[in-house]
Amino acid sequence: MSDIALTVSILALVAVVGLFIGNVKFRGIGLGIGGVLFGGIIVGHFVSQAGMTLSSDMLHVIQEFGLILFVYTIGIQVGPGFFASLRVSGLRLNLFAVLIVIIGGLVTAILHKLFDIPLPVVLGIFSGAVTNTPALGAGQQILRDLGTPMEMVDQMGMSYAMAYPFGICGILFTMWMLRVIFRVNVETEAQQHESSRTNGGALIKTINIRVENPNLHDLAIKDVPILNGDKIICSRLKREETLKVPSPDTIIQLGDLLHLVGQPADLHNAQLVIGQEVDTSLSTKGTDLRVERVVVTNENVLGKRIRDLHFKERYDVVISRLNRAGVELVASGDISLQFGDILNLVGRPSAIDAVANVLGNAQQKLQQVQMLPVFIGIGLGVLLGSIPVFVPGFPAALKLGLAGGPLIMALILGRIGSIGKLYWFMPPSANLALRELGIVLFLSVVGLKSGGDFVNTLVNGEGLSWIGYGALITAVPLITVGILARMLAKMNYLTMCGMLAGSMTDPPALAFANNLHPTSGAAALSYATVYPLVMFLRIITPQLLAVLFWSIG
């Protein structure tokens, strides 16, 4: 059997063993996708004992490509809601994540001085404990630049391998422990997160208001500022027993009932101007109007603003709200349509059918994946991650690397949505398949590389003490900040788990957090919110520690 065939076969075996381990649960808690790492260590040990030779170049390519696939699909998934989340809660999340990095660096410095751990070893333990491979590479590079002998630099890789598996376990254990301590109901947390997801952090509401302000009598809707803006949509008007879709030129009269859509604060302002809320139903049942949800799939309308399509004027149809990647938005005129947007339309059946034809509403297109944008995005992400950033006083340039670059590029492209006929929407099933494939490939290789000398170092060397040091570097920051975030900031549990995983730049921990609830995207969103800044800090922290320890001896 050729080296390539043998390598692929071993990787498949690792995936099977690891996924089996991950599916084993104790009291409902399992390793999930993180089990692949331990499957790799087990198989790697026996591969080493049998003297098998695997293709190191192929393993390296598979590891990096798997990581790229994982972070890219995460970015595409959360991109549409990422920047809205950043405005609402991003500062708080990033402050907690930075605190985790700082505490981890302090614990590392204390361990280095107290136990006189060699610099390469402690940097490797730090990188493994925070499960950050780019930190390992950055640390090795600066050690070489500082003139450290190669045999000492290689020790960094072994100590990294010792700390890495238990770094992952530490994150999973912390999530589980916090869940037990605070008696978290995951379903309740998911519902609370879902209820707070909108562009401004408030749930989109509807309200029926009676026109009671005499100053509004006989005015056109376009002449009433609060109804002609982008914060509130008037989707229905009822006069006596007649229900109709209002247009900008529709004249309102005292006693008219208006069905308004918007955020609670804006609807409250509308009440102050227009009149009181009423319990009268403005349902389309039994009328010649209907409400339908239509999906944007026509490439000709991508990137166009809602107001430029003139649906009200041409078809007498109102877009009452817009759902983008699970986030409910007020359908303001300035919003540009993206592939996969779901629009709530109100109008007559024939008019809605005409608008649906304009928008596309081709359900089969939602199941298709455009592969060209995928590889364009990955290529641009790799280029972004390869750009060196020179910082005064640093002997080596800093880079986002193959993990940070594709993630940031995917966030940007996911937010843009489309450029011309290229759209970065990816069906959820396809996104999940690529994401799971990527993380399985990445963890399989990491486990295989660690498995060869893992048992020997653990039993006969200083492996146990290295693991202990790594456990402290992992656990102390996570537990401290986790308790603070829950007690002081009342942070949502799923959001907190994503923040903890992101603060350790740990894809397996994110996979575990995602599996806590089958449909909630809270963990992925908070992970992506903190990941870019934390990745940069994780890359420069070992370099800062190396320069600091080297200078003070």
Swiss-Prot record:
Pfam family, one: TrkA_C
Molecular function as annotated in GO: monoatomic cation transmembrane transporter activity
Membrane topology classification: Multi-pass membrane protein
Subcellular location field: Cell membrane
Any GO BP: potassium ion transport
UniProt keywords, alphabetically: Cell membrane, Membrane, Repeat, Transmembrane, Transmembrane helix, Transport
Protein name: Putative transport protein YidE
Native source organism of the sequence: Escherichia coli (strain 55989 / EAEC)
